[in-house]
Amino acid sequence: SSCKEEEEEVTQSNPTARVQVIHNCADLAASSVDVYLNNNLLIDNFNFRTASSFIDAPAGEDFSVSIAPSSSMSSAEALVSYTYNLVEGETYILVAEGIISTTGYSPATAFSIEVYPMGREAASNEGNTDLLIHHGSTDAPTVDVVETGVGAGTIVDDASYGDFTSYLELSTADYTLEIRDASGQVTYATYSAPLLTLGLTGASAVVVASGFLDPSSNSNGEFFGLFVALPAGGDLVALPVAK
């Protein structure tokens, strides 16, 4: 009947936004979690340093994202829950990070989900790789990222915990990234960013600073590194320490 047809049309036109979730919480208590969208299990046994693919999420209405232990049976067991209202047609990057435990971590920066609302699923120019860089290491200071391989210089200036850069639109090549202190004088670590070798021509990706500079003060959690989340999701790709 016509009534039924109208219902179907309403169902088809539900507005959506695109969302990728990245697990960057280095707290051992959250090494694997369940993620619920409203009360539905979205990601089962979501492991540290993995990402979802981009998924459709409801837009224009409040919905909840809940993080629960990997053994959870329902969202009622959530450790934390957040409410979002997304803009139709927009693309969002969500990064889960921080500390859930009450002891064993210094600093014990509170768990949060950081949101970047202008995400990309591909590069804006097919010859480039678009990188979004995010500082998600709880015990790392404010840093600069300096490219020394092709001489691009300071590509990130004074990034503090929780910060996102805007997208860096880079010619797809193999780069060398130095993590320096805010003065730019002290180099903490140097990484290869082999965008060409990784086959990222025309792709976008999120680079997260992850883990602990001082694991001994953080329950011997995973050591600091730069990790790449690809649009297809899956395990984050560790950028190798430069030789």
Predicted segments, located by residue:
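Intrinsically disordered, low-complexity polar regions and short flexible loop motifs
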Residues: 3-243
